[in-house]
Amino acid sequence: MKMNTERFNLTVDEYLAETNVLFYLNDAVTQLLEHKEEYTQFGVVRYFAEYFTSVKNGNHVLFREFSYIKATPHNRESFIHIFWKCFRQIGKNGDLLAMSEYSSLLQLLCPDFPAEMVQNTARIVLIDDVTDCLMSFSDFIYSFQIQFFYEEFVESISAIYQDLLSGKNPNTVIVPTSTSVEQLSSSANDKPDVQEGVDATIFCECIEGLCERFKHKYPSTVAIKEILDNTQRVSFYGFLMALAKHEGINQDIGALPNKPDLLIDPEMDQELERLIAQVAISPTSNNNSSSSALGQKEMSKKASPRKSLHQRKRIEMESDGSTEETDSSEN
């Protein structure tokens, strides 16, 4: 988790709510009770220490159920970051994958990850094209970040967009200008055109009204206004793609580097170079045994993704987030 100096200005209750400490404590206790015999041998104090260290480092979401990885903003950010680290090599190789293939990759990390989330991401990349076209890693992951991290926001503005498209007044508390009222009235008399989109000014006012009372995470209103001020009309998926490409929004989430650095991971590259050097100087038998060990680890992950925390912790400590194994096996 990121260190936030403003936490010192919060009350105890505000801090607990903002950091979701009680959620993680409840999950830790639940897992402890479910695997009591195992953790008694492991050591309860050590268990709690490693659980919260895992939460802090962001690798606690590996192989967890979908309801868990989407439960908090930190979990969502951590999952996006792990997905990038695990499969960055796809983008580095320039591979294009279909929607079903990206869905399979996500389910390697989260067995019950819903295909609908991937379909919605593909619609952003392909601008609502239902065809299962091939997508680059960079286009997919930045669009996935918006769809997954801001899921509730995306659903809410979709409803607003559909109301505007059909000429209805969205159920949002806004203070419209005289100009926007005239524009809304005139648009109601016209037939909706999905391709043309809706008036960007009215859409922006509706979104700002939504954000004033929204309880979930949403992109910066400054960034939203910046995007919508540059056009007269906007389509829903065109707007989402603009959010996905906005560097400021990406930095606010904090899960991914900016696009020029997306395929760069110095620590991972150094580890890969070290492994390649070891293979180059090792005898064939040594190489085979090393490959076998990696294969066994991969098989153990896929065979039993719902491992107990203790088992997952051993994997994480061995692989430092499980990313080295993924990248090295792909190379």
UniProtKB/Swiss-Prot annotation:
Basic residues composition bias: residue spans: 303-313
GO cellular component: centriolar satellite; cytoplasm; microtubule
Organs and tissues of expression: Expression in elevated in ciliated tissues/organs, including brain, spinal cord, kidney, eyes, ears and lateral line.
Superkingdom per UniProt: Eukaryota
Record's subunit section: Interacts with PCM1. Interacts with the complex TPGC. Binds to alpha-tubulin.
Family: Belongs to the CSTPP1 family.
Function: Regulator of the tubulin polyglutamylase complex (TPGC) that controls cytoskeletal organization, nuclear shape, and cilium disassembly by balancing microtubule and actin assembly. Regulates the assembly and stability of the TPGC and thereby modulates polyglutamylation of the microtubule, which antagonizes MAP4 binding.
Name of the featured protein: Centriolar satellite-associated tubulin polyglutamylase complex regulator 1
Organism listed in the record: Danio rerio (Zebrafish)
